[in-house]
Structures are given as structure tokens and as C-alpha cells.
């Protein structure tokens, strides 16, 4: 099968995130498929962007053909919108060229925003290919709720037209969000066209030796000093979206539990607010450590007894979430306290932790106490449920196969 993957923000191991298109495409190439990914030369998500001198510049990455369209750099909203519109227009204008060169059997529109569905469908029609819309976030609902845009804003109205266009014409919707089907149907998607393919993991990155890698001396010294205590851990970015401040405030509530210690590993703009709470409350039951490379996350997580994953209040979370950090914790057999407004989340479905309301410090503290008061064996049994679920259901090889099944019948 020839697969054309349109992903404005596509990344790679060299450039950084976004990784999902790379991992799926790598598995498809292994299975004998031909994959072309079209992306923009500029993305705010990448660690570094490719040097692109002209449109349709090509690059081979692990057997995947990357095709770059030149895009303007951006920081603010206006220049980002210009970047989006330029990318979509170049696809639309060159649809015949792309169809002839790629000869796709399947066209995937996957650029977060829905406007790339218009050129994706055109290319599919010119090629006689199937066409699917891959949903990462629900647009334009996400920028409306997060950015405060009115539904009458011209940008939002254009994006709403793009979303509705996709649901009307698509052969299938592939969603990272497990509970988004009702929303899609409300906007016009026909019955039987919704498939959930969440984010996955690469087993090669989680071999047992990863857990034994040497971590920085500063980190090892802290963990050595906490032997005998129940460690509640978080490893990741200190951003407002992760609502780590609620975990810090839970440490305030549990400061008299001398058997429980909080360890946070990371960096980010919210760090000063955490340090302020720690200083004001004279906390001795929490330690903040510098971030570590992604390769050391298993070796860090193995020292935790309980993991925390949080979010802010958002109705968007009711449609489902797809946190890579969740998978990391589950692969480490950690029981999870998930403070996200996601009823029926994987934590609840699998039974690998406790889900509570987002930003509810008392509920977070109570969940931690409940897990801390379990025996070590009980916590490990709970954590193993998560690991077994991920290993069975979320290898990229399986997800890549599941992705193509609806288009191979």
C-alpha cells in the first residue's frame, strides 16, 4: 500500500516531536508499505527544524520519505495562522502533482487543525485513494476553550467549516481520543466511521536494561536517602497544563505523613510557584530535582512507588486524553493518581490507579493516602495491570496494523 501522511508538525528522532507519524510510518515501512509524509519546514514543537531551501525538498528517514514545504517561522497567532494557510494552500495548489508522484492508496490528514482535509480529499479523489482524518485534538473547540476565541471569530468559523467538511466526506476518522465519537457524529460523521488508535510505545526503548541505567548522582543520593519511605513521583515538564501545583499542595496537606515523600523531576516555567509553596509552608516532605534525558525516565521512575498525572479543569478531557507520560508510568508498573476530568479513563478501565477530579487537592491527597496505606505487594499488583495493558495493546507495531485494517478490506 502507498500511504500519504499529511502532518504539518511531523518530527523525527533527529528533529524532535511530533513523533506519532514517525513511529506509525516506521512500522508500515517494516511491513512493506511505501510511506510519504508531507510536513512544514517550521514547527514550534520540534527541537530543531530542517533546513529547507525549496518546496517539495525530500529527505529519507528510516525508510520513510519526508517531503518538506517551506513555511514561515512564527511566534504569535497571526504569523502561525499565515503558516497554516500557506501549508494548506500549497497542498491544494499542488494536489495533482502530489497525486501523480505518490500514487497513494490511503491519504491521511493529520495536522491537528482540520483544514488539511480539503487538499487531502482532493488528492485522494485524484488518486482513487481512501481518505482519513486523524484527530489529535478537537478543533476548533480546543482553541475556543483554551484560547477564548468566539465561535464567530473568522478563524474559528473557517476551522469549523474544515471540521464539518472532514466528517461529511471522510472514509474513516482515526482518533487518539477514545471518547470523541459522539462529538464527531454531532458534527456530521456517519455511523461506523469512527476508530480509536491511541498513542503507543516502542518496545525497543523499554528493554529491561533501561531501568538499570546510571542516573545523575544528585538524583541517586536523594533516592538512597528516602529508602523505607513511600515515594510519590512526577517526572516531566513544570507547566500550568500539567497542574503539578496541585501535587505540591497535596504535599502540604500530607506534611505530617513522615512515611510519604514527594519527588518531582523536571523543569519549566511553573517551578518558582512550587518553590514558593514549599518555602511558605516549610515543607520537608518534597524534593525537586533537575530534569533528565528521556532515555533515563525508566531508571528514574523505578524509584517511585506512586505516580501522579494531572491536568486543569477542561471539558475537552471528557473526550479522552492520550498522555505519553501515562504510558511511561504504566510501563514502570506504577499505580497512578490521575487528577484529570476524564470519566472512564484508562486508569479506571484497567484498574491501575485512582482517578480524581482535576485541581481537587483534597481528593489527590486522599488518593495518595489510600495507595500509601496499601502494602507494597498490593500497589505492585495494581501497577502490573497497567504494564500488562500497555504491552498487550499499545506497541506501535500493533497500532500501525490496527490503523490500516479498515482500509484493507
Task: Give residue spans per PLM region.
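N-terminal subdomain of nucleotide-sugar transferases
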Residues: 1-64, 254
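Conserved donor-binding/catalytic core segment of Leloir-type glycosyltransferases
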Residues: 4, 225-251, 263
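Carbohydrate-associated surface elements
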Residues: 41, 179, 200
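Membrane-proximal helix-turn-helix segments that form the acceptor-binding/catalytic region
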Residues: 96, 115-118, 122-127, 153-175
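A short, well-ordered alpha-helix in the C-terminal region of glycosyltransferases
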Residues: 124, 377-392, 405
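Nucleotide-sugar-dependent
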Residues: 242, 293-330, 337-348
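Nucleotide-activated donor-binding/catalytic signature segment of Leloir-type glycosyltransferases, i.e.
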Residues: 265, 272-299
Amino acid at each position: 500500500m502507498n500511504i500519504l501522511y499529511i502532518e504539518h508538525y511531523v518530527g523525527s528522532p533527529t528533529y524532535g516531536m511530533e513523533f506519532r507519524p514517525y513511529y506509525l510510518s516506521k512500522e508500515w515501512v517494516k511491513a512493506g508499505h511505501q510511506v510519504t509524509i508531507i510536513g512544514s519546514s517550521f514547527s514550534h514543537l520540534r527541537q530543531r527544524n530542517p533546513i529547507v531551501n525549496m518546496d517539495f525538498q525530500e529527505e529519507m528517514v528510516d525508510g520513510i520519505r519526508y517531503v518538506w514545504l517551506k513555511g514561515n517561522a512564527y511566534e504569535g497567532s497571526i504569523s502561525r495562522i499565515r503558516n497554516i494557510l500557506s501549508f494548506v494552500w500549497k497542498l491544494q495548489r499542488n494536489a495533482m502533482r502530489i497525486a501523480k508522484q505518490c500514487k497513494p492508496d490511503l491519504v491521511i490528514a493529520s495536522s491537528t487543525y482540520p483544514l488539511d482535509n480539503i487538499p487531502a480529499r482532493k488528492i485522494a479523489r485524484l488518486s482513487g485513494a481512501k481518505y482519513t482524518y486523524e484527530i489529535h485534538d478537537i478543533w476548533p473547540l480546543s482553541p475556543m476553550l483554551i484560547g477564548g476565541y468566539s465561535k464567530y471569530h473568522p478563524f474559528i468559523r473557517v476551522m469549523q467549516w474544515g471540521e464539518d467538511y472532514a466528517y461529511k466526506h471522510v472514509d474513516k476518522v482515526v482518533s487518539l481520543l477514545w471518547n470523541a465519537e459522539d462529538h464527531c457524529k454531532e458534527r456530521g460523521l456517519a455511523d461506523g466511521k469512527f476508530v480509536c488508535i491511541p498513542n503507543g510505545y516502542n518496545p525497543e526503548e523499554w528493554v529491561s536494561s533501561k531501568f538499570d541505567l546510571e542516573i545523575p548522582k544528585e538524583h541517586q543520593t536523594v533516592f538512597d536517602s528516602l529508602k523505607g519511605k513511600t515515594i510519590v513521583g512526577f517526572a516531566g515538564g513544570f507547566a500550568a497544563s500539567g497542574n503539578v501545583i496541585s501535587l505540591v499542595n497535596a504535599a502540604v496537606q500530607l506534611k505530617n505523613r513522615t512515611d510519604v515523600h514527594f519527588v518531582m523531576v523536571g523543569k519549566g516555567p511553573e517551578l518558582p510557584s512550587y518553590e514558593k509553596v514549599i518555602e511558605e509552608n516549610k515543607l520537608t516532605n518534597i524534593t525537586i530535582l533537575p530534569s533528565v534525558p528521556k532515555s533515563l525516565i525508566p531508571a528514574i521512575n523505578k524509584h517511585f512507588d506512586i505516580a501522579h498525572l494531572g491536568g486543569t479543569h477542561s471539558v475537552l478531557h471528557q473526550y479522552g486524553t492520550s498522555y505519553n507520560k501515562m504510558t511511561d508510568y504504566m510501563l514502570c508498573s506504577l499505580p497512578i493518581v490521575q487528577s484529570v476530568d476524564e470519566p472512564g479513563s484508562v486508569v479506571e478501565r484497567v484498574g491501575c490507579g485512582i482517578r480524581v477530579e482535576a485541581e481537587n487537592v483534597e481528593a489527590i491527597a486522599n488518593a495518595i493516602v489510600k495507595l500509601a496505606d496499601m502494602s507494597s505487594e498490593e500497589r505492585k499488583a495494581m501497577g502490573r495491570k497497567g504494564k500488562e495493558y500497555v504491552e498487550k495493546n499499545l506497541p506501535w507495531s500493533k497500532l500501525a496494523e490496527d490503523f490500516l485494517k479498515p482500509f484493507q478490506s
